Amino acid sequence: MRLVIARCRVDYVGRLTAHLPTARRLLLIKADGSVSIHADDRAYKPLNWMSPPCWLVEDTVEDAEALWVVTNKAGEELRITIEEIEHDSSHELGVDPGLVKDGVEAHLQELLAEHVETLGSGYTLVRREYMTAIGPVDLLCRNADGASVAVEIKRRGDIDGVEQLTRYLELLNRDPLLAPVSGVFAAQQIKPQAKTLATDRGIRCLVLDYEALRGTESTEFRLF
C-alpha cells in the first residue's frame, strides 16, 4: 500500500463529472490497483475513488505539478493534480486473513445458505463468500428466472451495510457473465434509514428470524 499526503485537486471524468478544489488530502494506492482520496473526516469513506480494475499513470505538467491519471476499463478517469507532496511511503501488508464474523452473523449466513428458499421461491445458491475485488459477498444466488442475486447478511442492518452491498453490486454488474445482478440486504434488524437507502437503490430488504431459521420457531419472514 502506498500512502501519499499532498496538496492536490481532483477531477472525475466519466458518466458524471465531479471536482475537488485544492486541499491537503491523503491518497491511498492499494495493491489491487484501487486509488482513493481521503480528507481528515468521514471515517473510512473516501471523497472520491476508482475501483479496480484500473491503471495509474504519473506524469509531470507545467509549473512542476504532477498529474496522476487513473483510468478504468470503461475509460472513466480520476485526474489528480498534485501541487506539493508532504509524505510518500509504501508498505507491504501481506495477505490479510479477512474479517472474522461473530458467531450469530456467521451462523445466519450458514443457515440462509442451507435454506436459500427463504429468499424466495425458486432461489438456488451459487456460492457462499463469493469473492470480489473488494472482498467477499456473503451469498451469490440465482432467482427463479435465473438472474444473479447478491445477498449481504448482517445481525443489525444499518446504512454502512447497504453501502457495502452497493459497492459489491457495482463490481458484480461489470461482469458480463453475472449481470444484471440485484441485491438483497438481510438482517435480524434493519434500521429505518438503511431500509430507505436500500429501497432507493433498488435493493430488497429481508428481516431474518434467527430462531426460526434454526427451526425452533415459526418460519415466517417479513419482506419489504
Swiss-Prot record:
- EC top class, in one word? hydrolase
Enzyme Commission number(s) from the entry: 3.1.-.-
Q: Which InterPro entries match?
A: Endonuclease_NucS, NucS_C, NucS_N, NucS_N_sf, tRNA_endonuc-like_dom_sf
Provide the transmembrane region boundaries: none
Q: Which cellular component, as a GO term, is one annotated location?
A: cytoplasm
Q: Write down the superkingdom of origin.
A: Bacteria
User: Where does the protein end up?
Assistant: Cytoplasm
Q: What is its main location?
A: cytoplasm
Q: Which GO terms describe its molecular function?
A: DNA binding; single-stranded DNA endodeoxyribonuclease activity
- Which keywords label this protein? Cytoplasm, DNA-binding, Endonuclease, Hydrolase, Nuclease
Q: What is this protein called?
A: Endonuclease NucS
The gene it comes from is nucS
